[in-house]
């Protein structure tokens, strides 16, 4: 039998509950021209009371099944113009509908569907799955507070076969890695940024700008590329250029795993393999991260 006595020796740091991976396909029909948004949404609520944890009293709990249904209904009545706006709609609903909800955290991930196109003509209702970067967002709002909005890109896998090297690093008794002036550079981009505010922000267009900037700084000019002396330098260059192009972004976090491709030794077969046949290695892999933010002076 559950105890009804509160333990005075411990205190809550944070609580939350909700529903994860609520999937929705929303279809906007404008005559024969259809537009779609498929999303997976996770919602976490924090309540003012902790009586459900301490005493097993469920009288304040909004069931997670209700949370799931709410996501479905908001998609119907509000639509999904962008995943960021949809997440803000969810936050606003729970904070305005339930006085004992003090915090709402919403994560939304968009399935990368792209409209079919041929010879410049777009199909009116057919789409193809194009995994060239997944658009996600996180929105958190507290009672009497403004929403804090993060957007991001993940699962954007890119590779270039040259214009990358790694030299001049520390060498000790455990170092076996040779310096290299020319190598393959492959990574799977994770990029997340925070907006200063939500007013007059075109979230879809901003996401496209950031993604294009990532590809631009990774690849360089189409006819010759751009040399990368390290993953760190490429990461930083992406951040600096992005913040210069999008003034609404306050800070940006990037994670770039260094996905390795090694030359296969064919000497025992009497063959010389000049970086033509390489072995992809899933792990271990290097992982480079960095977060930058605008200096206060740059916002004045």
UniProtKB/Swiss-Prot annotation:
> Which residues are annotated with the PTM N6-succinyllysine?
6, 19, 217, 224
Keywords in alphabetical order, please: Acetylation, Oxidoreductase, Peroxisome, Phosphoprotein, Purine metabolism
Phosphotyrosine: residues bearing it: 285
Q: Does the keyword Oxidoreductase apply?
A: yes
Gene3D superfamilies membership: Urate Oxidase
Task: Please name one Pfam family that this protein belongs to.
Answer: Uricase
- Positions where N6-acetyllysine occurs in the chain: 6, 19, 23, 32, 114, 118, 160, 171, 181, 217, 224, 274
Q: Where in the cell is it found?
A: Peroxisome
**Pathway this chain belongs to:** Purine metabolism; urate degradation; (S)-allantoin from urate: step 1/3
* Record-listed E.C. numbers: 1.7.3.3
A GO term from the CC aspect: peroxisome
Q: Which reaction does it catalyse?
A: urate + O2 + H2O = 5-hydroxyisourate + H2O2
Q: Where is the active site?
A: 19, 64, 260
As stated in the Swiss-Prot or TrEMBL entry, residues carrying the post-translational modification Phosphoserine are: 35, 59, 228
Q: Which GO terms describe its molecular function?
A: urate oxidase activity
Top-level taxon: Eukaryota
Q: Where does urate bind?
A: 64-65, 166, 183, 231-232, 258
Query: What InterPro entries does the record tag this protein with?
Result: Uricase, Uricase_CS
Q: Which residues carry this modification: N-acetylalanine?
A: 2
GO terms for biological process, alphabetical? purine nucleobase catabolic process; urate catabolic process
Q: Where is this motif: Microbody targeting signal?
A: 298-300
Q: What function does this protein fulfil?
A: Catalyzes the oxidation of uric acid to 5-hydroxyisourate, which is further processed to form (S)-allantoin.
Question: Which family does this protein fall into?
Answer: Belongs to the uricase family.
User: Which PANTHER family does the record cross-reference, listed alphabetically?
Assistant: URICASE
Q: What is this protein called?
A: Uricase
Q: What is the lineage of its organism?
A: Eukaryota, Metazoa, Chordata, Craniata, Vertebrata
Q: Which gene encodes it?
A: UOX
């Amino acid at each position: 039998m559950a105890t009804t006595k509160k333990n005075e020796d411990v205190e809550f740091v944070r609580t939350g509950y909700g529903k994860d991976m609520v999937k929705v396909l929303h279809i906007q029909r404008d005559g024969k021209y259809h537009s779609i948004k498929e999303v997976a949404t996770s919602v976490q609520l924090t309540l003012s009371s902790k009586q459900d944890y301490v005493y097993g009293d469920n009288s304040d709990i909004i069931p997670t099944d209700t949370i799931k249904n709410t996501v479905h209904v908001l998609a119907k009545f509000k639509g999904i113009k962008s995943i960021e706006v949809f997440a803000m709609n969810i936050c606003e609903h729970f904070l305005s509908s339930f006085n004992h909800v003090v915090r709402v955290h919403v994560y939304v991930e968009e399935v990368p569907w792209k409209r079919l196109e041929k010879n410049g003509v777009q199909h009116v209702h057919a789409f193809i799955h194009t995994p060239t970067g997944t658009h996600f967002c996180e929105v958190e709002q507290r009672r009497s507070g403004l929403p804090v909005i993060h957007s991001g890109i993940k699962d954007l896998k890119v590779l270039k076969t040259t214009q990358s090297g790694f030299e001049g690093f520390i060498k000790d008794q455990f170092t076996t890695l040779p310096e290299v002036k020319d190598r393959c550079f492959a990574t799977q981009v994770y990029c997340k940024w925070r907006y200063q505010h939500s007013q007059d922000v075109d979230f879809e267009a901003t996401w496209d700008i950031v993604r294009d900037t990532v590809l631009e700084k990774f690849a360089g000019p189409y006819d010759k590329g751009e040399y990368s002396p390290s993953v760190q330098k490429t990461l930083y260059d992406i951040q600096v250029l992005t913040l210069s192009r999008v003034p609404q972004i306050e800070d940006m976090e990037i994670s770039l795993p260094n996905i390795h491709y090694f030359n296969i030794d064919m000497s025992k077969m009497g063959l010389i393999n000049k970086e033509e046949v390489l072995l992809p290695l899933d792990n271990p892999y290097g992982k480079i991260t960095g977060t930058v933010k605008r200096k206060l002076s740059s916002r004045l």
